[in-house]
Amino acid sequence: MAQTLQMEIPNFGNSILECLNEQRLQGLYCDVSVVVKGHAFKAHRAVLAASSSYFRDLFNNSRSAVVELPAAVQPQSFQQILSFCYTGRLSMNVGDQFLLMYTAGFLQIQEIMEKGTEFFLKVSSPSCDSQGLHAEEAPSSEPQSPVAQTSGWPACSTPLPLVSRVKTEQQESDSVQCMPVAKRLWDSGQKEAGGGGNGSRKMAKFSTPDLAANRPHQPPPPQQAPVVAAAQPAVAAGAGQPAGGVAAAGGVVSGPSTSERTSPGTSSAYTSDSPGSYHNEEDEEEDGGEEGMDEQYRQICNMYTMYSMMNVGQTAEKVEALPEQVAPESRNRIRVRQDLASLPAELINQIGNRCHPKLYDEGDPSEKLELVTGTNVYITRAQLMNCHVSAGTRHKVLLRRLLASFFDRNTLANSCGTGIRSSTNDPRRKPLDSRVLHAVKYYCQNFAPNFKESEMNAIAADMCTNARRVVRKSWMPKVKVLKAEDDAYTTFISETGKIEPDMMGVEHGFETASHEGEAGPSAEALQ
């Protein structure tokens, strides 16, 4: 038998991508230009299509050398994501990660959405330790300089190992300071929403006044993040565990990492806080890590929602749900539901404290409630209760009911859904209002921890498709009537056309007969 020789070059694919990145930075062999708010970025179609489902679908439908992205995409975020498509590395300022996640979700880059969420949870966690991040779990935050990369071909070599990148990250004083910004939004939202009970006690555990009262003898240096750095030692000391040391230069707390014990999407603060639940202080201290991760997940979702809507620039305008228009046969049943002052007790036993906080108290059914605090998206108490009574514990049904409360049939029929998973290839159809979509998504995330944004994309696209079918069916009787009238008119015209030749034939025969009658006697006379 013939022998087979095999040769393998490690990291050859990475080297090719690095060289392609060098070509991109130098403007060599690029076959597409992506325009973002007037800024043109040259790239290779093959690399963009391999990294992003959005570009893959876009290039399948268009061969244009210039592609323009919507106004919701920011040039800085797209530049970082474009660099990620070539290098697999992300470099961003603290506080920009939420805008980056929004852009990655719009461009449908699953790697950033999956790994980035886990990485940002670790960074935002009070128990975060930069040395505990592994290569397979988190992307690097190493800053890269385009000037250094364009110096020549040697830049295509293997990048620095993760250990050196982590050490560089430790030397930055603001590497874990993204939590206070999200926390201020979260705390202010909870105060405005009137949230109380055990949930407020959990969130107060990580607030700045409580931490200052617990540790007055150890004020943190100005370069450190006081909220993030002091939270985990306080919890660890209360549980009888040694607190981690503080790095002098980086302000990063090293302590027992609890990020591996829980998943950010498997628990909910509302789920654990039933009306009759009781938590003693010892259990709360032991479960401090899990509660902290749960709260961090809520903060990231809230910050992601708020940052996305801030980019649209339309948060100042108030959005309200549509007035209810029900069929006569179901009007009595709906009226009984609208007369409810609060949610039924049996429904509360099933879903717990996962609904809007004002639904648990009696109130006017016509009262307008803000679906999510700070979004300016309002819905009446009766409509929201009808959504919950119809959905029960099924979050997908709740999502459909909420979308139907804000968008009528014609709006859905003339839309392409969320824009991420389009229900039509017609470029004239625009996505639904992003403010309503963000508010509904965040409300469903509070209701069901396992809610996925892809579910909303699919359901919205399905609702738009069904709305177009219903609108098309409603036009069918009118089209049939017009077609019947057109057929009758055509039949009348055809019959009229048949009558006219017959009349012409009769006249022609009469004239011929008269001529023959006149010619007959003259011929006989000649004879």
Swiss-Prot record:
Location of cross-link Glycyl lysine isopeptide (Lys-Gly) (interchain with G-Cter in SUMO1): 167
One example GO MF annotation: RNA polymerase II cis-regulatory region sequence-specific DNA binding
Low complexity compositional bias, start-end: 225-251
Main location group: nucleus
Biased amino acid composition, Acidic residues: 281-292
Compartments reported by the entry: Nucleus; Cytoplasm
Tissue occurrence: Overexpressed in several types of carcinomas including ovarian serous carcinomas. Expression levels positively correlate with tumor recurrence in ovarian serous carcinomas, and intense immunoreactivity in primary ovarian tumors predicts early recurrence. Up-regulated in ovarian carcinomas after chemotherapy, suggesting a role in development of chemotherapy resistance in ovarian cancer.
Regions of compositional bias (Polar residues) in chain numbering: 141-152, 255-277
One GO BP: positive regulation of cell population proliferation
Cross-link (Glycyl lysine isopeptide (Lys-Gly) (interchain with G-Cter in SUMO2)): 167, 183, 318, 452, 480, 483, 498
Function: Functions as a transcriptional repressor. Seems to function as a transcriptional corepressor in neuronal cells through recruitment of HDAC3 and HDAC4. Contributes to tumor progression, and tumor cell proliferation and survival. This may be mediated at least in part through repressing transcriptional activity of GADD45GIP1. Required for recruiting the proteasome from the nucleus to the cytoplasm and dendritic spines.
Noted disease: Neurodevelopmental disorder with epilepsy, cataracts, feeding difficulties, and delayed brain myelination: A neurodevelopmental disorder characterized by microcephaly, profound developmental delay, intellectual disability, cataracts, severe epilepsy including infantile spasms, irritability, failure to thrive, and stereotypic hand movements. Brain imaging reveals delayed myelination and cerebral atrophy.
Protein name, as recorded: Nucleus accumbens-associated protein 1
Gene source species: Homo sapiens
